[in-house]
Amino acid sequence: VLKLDIREVHYEMGESSTACCPIALALTEKFLGTHPSETSIWKKNGIPLFRGEVVKVFTEYTRFWHPIKNKIYEFNHDEKIQKFIIEFDDWYESSADMKTLPLEETTINFPKPTCVWKSELGLHQPQFL
């Protein structure tokens, strides 16, 4: 199981609430070109409907007047997810600035949002290629 801990540090989407468009949604659309609803593992009574290796994305987000909220997205580790991992890997390797940062904490700047990745295992490690 590959786990990604994604912690939001800034969010400016013009949404009524950050829950309307969490980071996992933006990242999935950015790298996979698809909406998470097409690849996510839906559960019935807490039991995954799909079997196999799972990629879990943990998000944490807040607004001025809201307490911190957490949400977990689970994705089947299929070709689309593998494509995401490879693309992230390529991006990491090609970024000179990123190589000076600790492996456990990587910042990725998108037009919106800005986020901090905390990867338990590290996407750039060879065993995930």
Report the location of each language-model feature.
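Domain-length accessory/inserted modules outside core catalytic folds
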Residues: V1-L129
